[in-house]
Amino acid sequence: MSHGPLRVGIGGPVGAGKTTLTEKLCAALAHRCSMAVITNDIYTREDAEALMRAQVLPAERIRGVETGGCPHTAIREDASINLAAVADLRRTFPDLDLILIESGGDNLAATFSPELADLTIYVIDTAAGQDIPRKRGPGLARSDLLVVNKTDLAPHVGVDLARLEADTQAARGQRPYVMARMRAGVGVEAIVAFLEREGGLQLLPQD
């Protein structure tokens, strides 16, 4: 019996690289499983349109949800608008293996209730500063996977990357994290492996 697609919530501050991560995952996985994407923006469908322009998925597999809410959550706390989008995608594509749900904001607890997402990925930006891991916000501490993005910017913004990783490790404890450069595709394989390992995602072999 099918339990339906794996639903993965992607959150993080504006500009951290959530849409780039979503795009890279689509490029890596679209030919290996049946997948779809839901993006959440405040008043526009900008992220959905960016994914369509990138042509990583057919347009009918991308849903742009306009939440009209606070930019720090951008997925309503009751999740109903996103649950409706999930249900619509499952009706349209009954064979779905994976749905990525990209938040427009960084409040992970409000963003992804357990009824909406099976796993959560939180993205932070190295350029946001050395002390981000030490602040230990809920997204950073509690997400199922933390992606520390734009590590190549560290020397340009005065961030000691070794210390940043040590602080990240301390903040995460036993929870996994990935040091990444999403634009270059660095870290994508580790995230795919996480989805297979923790989410039970079954993929066709690489071409």
Swiss-Prot record:
GO molecular function, one term: GTP binding
Repeat is among the record's keywords: no
Classification via Gene3D superfamilies: P-loop containing nucleotide triphosphate hydrolases
Keyword annotations of the record: Chaperone, Cytoplasm, GTP-binding, Nickel insertion, Nucleotide-binding
GO CC aspect terms: cytoplasm
Taxonomy, superkingdom: Bacteria
Biological process, per Gene Ontology: urea catabolic process
Places the protein is found: Cytoplasm
Binding positions for GTP per the UniProt entry: 12-19
Cited Pfam families: cobW
PANTHER family: UREASE ACCESSORY PROTEIN G
Known role: Facilitates the functional incorporation of the urease nickel metallocenter. This process requires GTP hydrolysis, probably effectuated by UreG.
Subunit structure as annotated in this protein's UniProt entry: Homodimer. UreD, UreF and UreG form a complex that acts as a GTP-hydrolysis-dependent molecular chaperone, activating the urease apoprotein by helping to assemble the nickel containing metallocenter of UreC. The UreE protein probably delivers the nickel.
Sequence similarity: Belongs to the SIMIBI class G3E GTPase family. UreG subfamily.
Protein name, per record: Urease accessory protein UreG
Organism for this UniProt entry: Cereibacter sphaeroides (strain ATCC 17029 / ATH 2.4.9)
